[in-house]
Design a protein with these regions (language model features):
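Nucleic-acid-processing active sites and adjacent nucleic-acid-binding tracks
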Residues: 32-63
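Basic, amphipathic alpha-helical segments enriched in Lys/Arg and hydrophobic/aromatic residues
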Residues: 291-328
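Phosphate-backbone recognition surface of nucleic-acid-processing proteins
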Residues: 213, 218-292, 296, 323, ...
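Gly/Thr-rich phosphate-binding beta-strand-loop-beta motif of the actin/hexokinase/Hsp70
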Residues: 4-30, 116, 218
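Long, charge-rich intrinsically disordered scaffolds of nucleic-acid metabolism proteins
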Residues: 81, 88-207
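Short glycine-rich phosphate-binding loop at a beta-alpha junction
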Residues: 60-72
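Intrinsically disordered, low-complexity and often Lys/Arg-enriched segments
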Residues: 1-12, 35, 323-328
C-alpha cells in the first residue's frame, strides 16, 4: 500500500481526516493529494493507527478528525485515542457548513476525507477528552433510547387498528418493551454506581426536584462536562440557549438551535411535569413567563434550560439541591 503524496506548494498542517463507512475507512492528510483506504475492522484499525503514529513522529503533533456516522466511528475513534492520538469527532452539520464555506459541492468518499482533514486543521476549539467508562455507559443508554422509540412506534401502530385481536398483540408488545426498558434502566444504574464518582454525580442531579432517574442518567452520561462549565455554556451544549437573530432593522424572535439532541429531548420531557407539579421554582418561572405573554413552548424551553443550569450548579458545588420557590 502506497503512502500519502504531498501536493506541491502545500505543507502538512498536522491534521488527518477519516471518512467512515460501515466497511471502509478513507483517510487523507491535510495537504496531501492522495488518500488511503483501510477496512473498518480490527486489522484495518491497527494498520491505520500505525500509519497515523508514523505521520505524527514525522511531523510532530497530529490531530485526526472523523465525522459522526451513526456509531460506525466509535470503535476507530477509541482505538486512535488509545494509541495516543488526538481525535475530534465532528457532527455532520459542522462538516457540511465547512463545505459550504469552501464552496465544495461534489461529494465522494475521498473528497469527504480531504474535507474533514481541512476542517480538522482549521478547528480551534478544545478537544473533548472522552472517559472510556462514559463511552460504555452511553452505548447502554442508546439501547434504552431505542427501546423507548420502539414503544412510541408500537403505540402509534396501535391507533391504526380496530381489530381487538391485533390490538391485543400490539399491547403485549408494548408491555414487553416497557419491561425491557425498566430492566435496562436498572442495569444501567447498577453499572454506573460501580464507579463511586459517577454514582455521586447521579445522586446530585437526581436530587433536583423535577429531574427523575431517567433524565439524570441522560445528563450524567451525555453531558459529562456538567459541573466544569458556566451556566451559559451548559445551556448552549444542551441546545437550550436562545440565539439572537438581528441584522440591520430585522430583529426576529430568539430561538434555540444545535447542541446535543438526545440531552435536549430528555430534559425537555422532564420540564413539563417539573413546571406543573414537581419543582416550585420551575412552576414559578413557568407561570411568570406565561403572564408576560410567552407561548407555552417558549416557557417550557426556559424551564428546561433552568433544569440544566440547576444540574450544572449542584455538580459545581458538590452539594445537594435545596428546595426553593425562588428562581436561582
Amino acid at each position: 500500500m502506497q503512502g500519502w503524496v504531498r501536493e506541491e506548494g502545500h505543507c502538512n498542517t498536522g491534521a488527518a481526516g477519516v471518512d467512515v463507512s460501515k466497511h471502509e475507512l478513507v483517510v487523507a492528510l491535510a495537504g496531501a493529494s492522495t488518500v488511503m483506504r483501510f477496512s473498518n475492522d480490527t486489522a484495518g484499525h491497527g494498520e491505520l493507527c500505525r500509519r497515523m503514529s508514523k505521520a505524527q513522529r514525522q511531523d510532530g503533533r497530529l490531530r485526526v478528525g472523523l465525522e459522526a456516522s451513526g456509531g460506525y466511528e466509535r470503535k476507530i475513534a477509541a482505538t486512535l485515542r488509545k494509541a495516543g492520538l488526538e481525535v475530534i469527532v465532528f457532527q455532520p452539520a459542522q462538516v457540511r457548513a465547512y463545505a459550504h464555506y469552501l464552496g465544495q459541492r461534489a461529494k465522494t468518499d475521498p473528497i469527504d476525507a480531504r474535507l474533514i482533514a481541512l476542517c480538522t486543521a482549521a478547528y480551534q476549539g478544545q478537544t473533548r477528552q472522552v472517559d472510556p467508562r462514559i463511552a460504555q455507559l452511553a452505548e447502554h443508554l442508546t439501547y434504552i433510547e431505542q427501546v423507548e422509540q420502539d414503544i412510541v412506534r408500537f403505540k402509534t401502530r396501535l391507533d391504526g387498528f380496530t381489530s381487538g385481536r391485533f390490538k391485543t398483540f400490539i399491547e403485549a408488545d408494548i408491555k414487553r418493551l416497557k419491561q425491557r426498558r425498566a430492566a435496562a434502566i436498572r442495569a444501567l444504574v447498577k453499572a454506573l454506581r460501580e464507579h463511586p464518582d459517577l454514582g455521586q454525580r447521579l445522586d446530585l442531579v437526581a436530587g433536583i426536584d423535577g429531574i427523575g432517574e431517567r433524565t439524570a442518567l441522560a445528563l450524567v452520561i451525555r453531558m459529562p462536562e456538567l459541573g466544569s462549565m458556566t451556566r451559559e455554556q451548559a445551556a448552549s451544549l444542551a441546545g437550550l440557549a436562545p440565539f439572537d437573530v438581528q441584522s440591520g432593522k430585522m430583529d426576529r424572535i430568539r430561538h434555540i438551535q444545535g447542541g446535543r439532541t438526545r440531552v435536549r429531548r430528555s430534559i425537555y420531557a422532564a420540564a413539563l411535569p417539573a413546571a406543573f407539579k414537581w419543582n416550585p421554582a420551575i412552576i414559578n418561572l413557568y407561570q411568570r413567563l406565561m403572564a408576560k405573554g410567552r407561548s407555552h413552548k417558549q416557557a417550557l424551553v426556559a424551564c428546561a434550560r433552568k433544569l440544566v443550569i440547576y444540574a450544572n450548579t449542584v455538580l459545581q458545588r458538590g452539594t445537594p439541591w435545596i428546595k426553593t420557590t425562588q428562581n436561582q
